[in-house]
Amino acid sequence: MSKVRLAIIGNGMVGHRFIEDLLDKSDAANFDITVFCEEPRIAYDRVHLSSYFSHHTAEELSLVREGFYEKHGIKVLVGERAITINRQEKVIHSSAGRTVFYDKLIMATGSYPWIPPIKGSDTQDCFVYRTIEDLNAIESCARRSKRGAVVGGGLLGLEAAGALKNLGIETHVIEFAPMLMAEQLDQMGGEQLRRKIESMGVRVHTSKNTLEIVQEGVEARKTMRFADGSELEVDFIVFSTGIRPRDKLATQCGLDVAPRGGIVINDSCQTSDPDIYAIGECASWNNRVFGLVAPGYKMAQVAVDHILGSENAFEGADLSAKLKLLGVDVGGIGDAHGRTPGARSYVYLDESKEIYKRLIVSEDNKTLLGAVLVGDTSDYGNLLQLVLNAIELPENPDSLILPAHSGSGKPSIGVDKLPDSAQICSCFDVTKGDLIAAINKGCHTVAALKAETKAGTGCGGCIPLVTQVLNAELAKQGIEVNNNLCEHFAYSRQELFHLIRVEGIKTFEELLAKHGKGYGCEVCKPTVGSLLASCWNEYILKPEHTPLQDSNDNFLANIQKDGTYSVIPRSPGGEITPEGLMAVGRIAREFNLYTKITGSQRLAMFGAQKDDLPEIWRQLIEAGFETGHAYAKALRMAKTCVGSTWCRYGVGDSVGLGVELENRYKGIRTPHKMKFGVSGCTRECSEAQGKDVGIIATEKGWNLYVCGNGGMKPRHADLLAADIDRETLIKYLDRFMMFYIRTADKLTRTAPWLENLEGGIDYLKAVIIDDKLGLNAHLEEEMARLREAVLCEWTETVNTPSAQTRFKHFINSDKRDPNVQMVPEREQHRPATPYERIPVTLVEDNA
């Protein structure tokens, strides 16, 4: 069977999604795929385009896994544009003079930004907000500018305004309509959004018709002149006034094009030529062009199914949207303007908290038609499902948007009421039925469901509903959703933390007597030991705490494969003096230890006998060192590059900040180990974005990333805050650390903790930055108290003779373990293998 020649014109988000869907459902060997990628880089995420200003690396936005196209034999023509299509011969001619033949053609040409016919709009320092190249040009211009304007007060316009504000520009938004986001919000919602945005320093000008832009000004380089006679001087202008389908190729080759633009498609996404499909913003279905990515993804799925002979149809798309604009949560659902005949409204307004909510319901009060949410979108998921699935409303619909008081909860739609066809994840078109099928296959955690179905791996907004579906299905199957720590405590780790803190419990025995049963086990003892340390930070080798410690904490060192231990003193930020180096060398030589520089920028000594540990540490402490907590569930290190102190590219003192942070948080017990990274510029030599906490210097301060991870399951850290000063950075870190300590499950790193946190990074931002839970003052106080209690555990041990008896090999003998054997290698030594070991006589012959 010959391969199907498949050509794809366009390598944007929808074009790439088509390829992914195709390869999910069919073998790449069945196709000969050629992709025209007009831009200088392969598919990237335009939805999160503004984040580019934070990390300045196109790779961060890339949608294509490394080696993906090569692995599947896909030919991608980067920087090459399709210029003509010969439908009779089924051949495409490119800007590079190439000819590509096809059996099936996918047109995913997207859209182009429309600029109103304003005189002067094509002059220097006038931009659009569409590609990475656009953002580079805007940022370059911003460096020599003070004042900028965004023409257009819709979704993308406000996103662009947020980017300009973050660049330090005096920002103005110019909107032709009398309100912002006129398509998604009603009048009151638009006014509330305007007030919130203006309170952040962005100037908003509505009902403004721009007549011309002239290259002159007293305080700036340009002057915008409006129809009402007013003027505004700015240095540069960003246009965000809508999009138009890119259908020129279709017109040239004779395909049907809609009167208002867009390549006409049927329910199978076929054009007027059955061998040519159109998907995404270039397509017109029933005279409608969809400017959001989710409908484009659905079109890609339909086109794939039709090519493979499966039944599927595009039936339109819901254009509801939830997003954060300039830090303001905004949501619009369904008939947000109440245009349905007989529609009635319920309105909630809290001026003190700047929250506005409106429900639009049917005349009989039984069906939700639409909603407007400004300032708080926590109800968005439930309200959207009510609209999409026409679920009957409760007796008092206003209860859906009124705040819950005195512990009373809001009425829930109940996931059982949702049909299996209900779309839970719009990013990947995952239905409730898809989730149930995955649960029946054994996916019994949110993380497992995400891996199996991709639900929640896009914008993350569906995670609360995914969790509800999971818990409901597990309950139906009789699988108890139990987060108890173990059989001895009917509480979760988080609940035990609060019991210990509130009741001032200081020992395992006291906690067991008050809230547990039995004698404890290998699960609860080390967990409670960690909790007690996280709450009170007492010396872990106190007699009442010693039985709770695992093997490493028991001896304040990591046990190795041969029964010896490693010794790793702290070197904050990777900094160490020549005297310190010589001291480590002398000690390693004296005790015959193997030495190595670790991946954490620390000097490690291996092969220490247990009974030598106190003396080794006594000498290290005398040389100015302290424990590095390499054995503990705590901060291990803050890895740094040399930063602006030495590097000609550095823009921030990464070493200085790394040293400060490592010393600030050292010795504080956390649910799992933590690693920090601090980079002095975006070249990222300390690999900060692969750490639990990553900090990168910018021209304006520091970018703070959290919940990254290396190891077996690498995870890129999420940006928590951008361009913040040192004081704000430390404040956010104090809160983040304590919130993690309070809420994470036992032995959970920050990466899976965030992945299982309902609301993900947006929720974490709301807690840490916006104080959503009203906890920040308490979190800062708890961190301050823990820091005051920090001690070097080895200093305490060396100064406590009774604590050193545990380091003897044998209770009744001063002899050492004869099974420890070393062999030489590369001028040092290592543990002997079983084949290299010399037999040991354990019983002496006294004859």
Curated annotation (Swiss-Prot):
Binding site for NAD(+): 193-225
GO cellular component, one term: nitrite reductase complex [NAD(P)H]
Pathway where it operates: Nitrogen metabolism; nitrate reduction (assimilation)
Positions contributing to [4Fe-4S] cluster binding: C641, C647, C681, C685
Residues annotated to bind FAD: 44-79
Enzyme class: oxidoreductase
Keyword Iron: yes
Entry EC no(s): 1.7.1.15
Cofactor binding comment, as recorded: Binds 1 siroheme per subunit. Binds 1 [2Fe-2S] cluster per subunit.
Keywords: 2Fe-2S, 4Fe-4S, FAD, Flavoprotein, Heme, Iron, Iron-sulfur, Metal-binding, NAD, Nitrate assimilation, Oxidoreductase
GO molecular function: 2 iron, 2 sulfur cluster binding; 4 iron, 4 sulfur cluster binding; flavin adenine dinucleotide binding; heme binding; metal ion binding; NADP binding; nitrite reductase NADH activity
GO BP: fermentation; nitrate assimilation
Transmembrane segments: none
Cofactor(s) of this protein: siroheme; [2Fe-2S] cluster; [4Fe-4S] cluster; FAD
InterPro entries in the record: BFD-like_2Fe2S-bd_dom (IPR007419), BFD-like_2Fe2S-bd_dom_sf (IPR041854), FAD/NAD-bd_sf (IPR036188), FAD/NAD-binding_dom (IPR023753), FAD/NAD-linked_Rdtase_dimer_sf (IPR016156), NasD-like (IPR052034), NiRdtase/SiRdtase_haem-b_fer (IPR005117), Nit/Sulf_reduc_fer-like_dom_sf (IPR036136)
Zinc listed as a keyword: no
NCBIfam families, alphabetized: nitri_red_nirB (TIGR02374), PRK14989.1 (NF011565)
Entries under PANTHER family matching the protein: NITRITE REDUCTASE (NADH) LARGE SUBUNIT
Family: Belongs to the nitrite and sulfite reductase 4Fe-4S domain family.
Record's subunit section: Homodimer which associates with NirD.
Protein name per its UniProtKB record: Nitrite reductase (NADH) large subunit
